[in-house]
Regions:
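Intrinsically disordered, Ser/Thr-rich regulatory regions of eukaryotic membrane-trafficking proteins
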Residues: 1-177
Length: 177
């Protein structure tokens, strides 16, 4: 099985995450995201989650307001890719506690890290949720130690938001504008 790309788009067709496992020019990548995104967003919920686009089979699944999309070879197993997507979402749910679009916007590095732990060069590398979560916990510990060394350990979004008289969500939204 060879995954060519994985990307996440919102209902508004905004790209939230993109990982490419095959070589394409930036123009071709942008064209693929636009075309596949439009096709997927126009499909009805009861329609099949597999479509063919050029020389690729597109497998997608919607979770809340996000579409998780993967492009694979035409002869690859679509159900296996759906399971990989589901496993990825399960790990993100455990990592973020019911993952949402804002989690992916503000913690995109974790989303990429989890994907990199699970898929390498387009092949499923680590299917075990506990193993991926353990690696993520180690990364968080390392990051916390590095931040403590820099004096950033005590930065608290809630405290900053209260000082500005905003909710944490309003505070996060002010950065997305």
């Amino acid at each position: 099985m060879s995954i060519k790309y994985v990307f996440l788009i919102s209902r508004q067709a905004k790209l939230r995450l993109a990982k490419w496992y095959s070589t394409l020019s930036p123009k071709d990548k942008q064209k693929t995201v636009k075309e596949v995104g439009q096709i997927v967003l126009q499909r009805k919920p009861k329609q099949c989650n597999f479509i063919e686009h050029r020389d690729t089979k597109v497998v997608y699944r919607k979770y809340a307001s996000l579409y998780f999309i993967a492009g694979i070879d035409l002869d690859d197993n679509e159900l296996l890719v759906l399971e990989i997507i589901h496993r990825y979402v399960e790990v993100l749910d455990r990592a973020f506690g019911n993952v949402c679009e804002l989690d992916l916007i503000f913690n995109f590095q974790k989303a990429y890290f989890v994907l990199d732990e699970m898929v390498c060069a387009g092949e499923l590398l680590e299917p075990s949720k506990p193993t991926v979560l353990r690696c993520l916990a180690q990364m968080d510990e390392t990051e916390a130690a590095e931040n403590a060394d820099r004096g950033w350990a005590d930065i608290n979004l809630e405290g900053v938001a209260k000082t500005a008289m905003l909710t944490v969500q309003e505070f996060k939204q002010s950065f997305s504008r």
